[in-house]
Amino acid sequence: MAVEMFYDDDADLSIIQGRKVAVIGYGSQGHAHSLSLRDSGVDVRIGLKEGSKSRAKAEEQGLTVGTPAEVSEWADVIMVLAPDTAQASIFTNDIEPNLKDGDALFFGHGLNIHFELIKAPEFVTVGMVAPKGPGHLVRRQFVDGKGVPALIAIDQDPKGEGQALALSYAKAIGGARAGVIKTTFKEETETDLFGEQAVLCGGTEELVKTGFEVMVEAGYAPEMAYFEVLHELKLIVDLMYEGGIARMNYSVSDTAEFGGYLSGPRVIDAGTKERMKAILADIQSGEFTRRLVANVENGNTELEGLRKANAEHPIEVTGKKLRDLMSWVDRPITETA
């Protein structure tokens, strides 16, 4: 099914310019949205809790900062860009008591609305504007006069103005320059979670670790295994990112291409596909979200345990040693502190 696309000429910037926008959070997306909204002539304020390390940064960049409650009371469009696991409590404690008839509540990801962790009053417009790129790229493209494609969705539209408002917001952060895709909260949430879990984060991570283990257990040096299954992954992903799988296969050697065709289906087979379907079913049913919420309610104990086990994998020890040799690699804070 073809998606519905919108561009700059389909969006009226004056709509969002006539509103007061509160952006809750000042992380990767928060700073990109806020600065680009401001540069597009929108009256914007940032909502951050007292003591947040981001307050000084936002103020240094010329933005007005208040608590989430203060800016929610002031605004008539509230964009929630805090972490997923913090949004429900922020909504209950700071946003909901300050909602007024005609307000719009926007999100950068649909999880809390789709799985009803947040239930907005019926008089509030509920929508989503979600650039398909990290915040630094969204901001850089905006400054360069370009844009990152964005998604919009409307979940609740009591005034019949939701789509026009979302398109106006998307235009203000540069999304309509590249193209805006209309979707739903359900589609965005479930596809995003599946991609993260089955392929981008969970699937790729386990594939890399297992490949490393197979090579080391067969007697190869950990350093050689690291280079072959992790370090060179970026080269392949960059080719796929630039021109799809066909571009990657065109660019690698015939030996690599032929071997990939033969061995890839032996690694990712029909059984893998069935397990992926089971992951998708857990997402669709809300089982994953229930487990996510339970983890937060239990003080992140499950997540911390998983993090610890992952950090202790031998590939991490080998990787840190090899990255010390790579002057061109940006080192993470955890390795440079």
Swiss-Prot record:
Mg(2+) 2 binds at D192, E228, E232. Substrate binds at S253. One of its GO terms (cellular component) is cytosol. GO terms for molecular function: ketol-acid reductoisomerase activity; magnesium ion binding; NADP binding. Keywords: Amino-acid biosynthesis, Branched-chain amino acid biosynthesis, Magnesium, Metal-binding, NADP, Oxidoreductase. Residues 3-183 form the KARI N-terminal Rossmann domain. It catalyses: (2R)-2,3-dihydroxy-3-methylbutanoate + NADP(+) = (2S)-2-acetolactate + NADPH + H(+); (2R,3R)-2,3-dihydroxy-3-methylpentanoate + NADP(+) = (S)-2-ethyl-2-hydroxy-3-oxobutanoate + NADPH + H(+). Residues 184-329 form the KARI C-terminal knotted domain. Its EC number is 1.1.1.86. Binds 2 magnesium ions per subunit. GO terms for biological process: isoleucine biosynthetic process; L-valine biosynthetic process. Pathway: Amino-acid biosynthesis; L-isoleucine biosynthesis; L-isoleucine from 2-oxobutanoate: step 2/4; Amino-acid biosynthesis; L-valine biosynthesis; L-valine from pyruvate: step 2/4. NADP(+) binds at Y26, G27, S28, Q29, K49, S52, S54, D84, T85, A86, Q87, G135. Mg(2+) 1 binds at D192, E196. Its cofactor is Mg(2+). The active site is at H109. NCBIfam families: ilvC, PRK05479.1. Belongs to the ketol-acid reductoisomerase family. Involved in the biosynthesis of branched-chain amino acids (BCAA). Catalyzes an alkyl-migration followed by a ketol-acid reduction of (S)-2-acetolactate (S2AL) to yield (R)-2,3-dihydroxy-isovalerate. In the isomerase reaction, S2AL is rearranged via a Mg-dependent methyl migration to produce 3-hydroxy-3-methyl-2-ketobutyrate (HMKB). In the reductase reaction, this 2-ketoacid undergoes a metal-dependent reduction by NADPH to yield (R)-2,3-dihydroxy-isovalerate. HAMAP family: IlvC. This is Ketol-acid reductoisomerase (NADP(+)). The lineage of its organism: Bacteria, Bacillati, Actinomycetota, Actinomycetes, Mycobacteriales. The gene is ilvC.
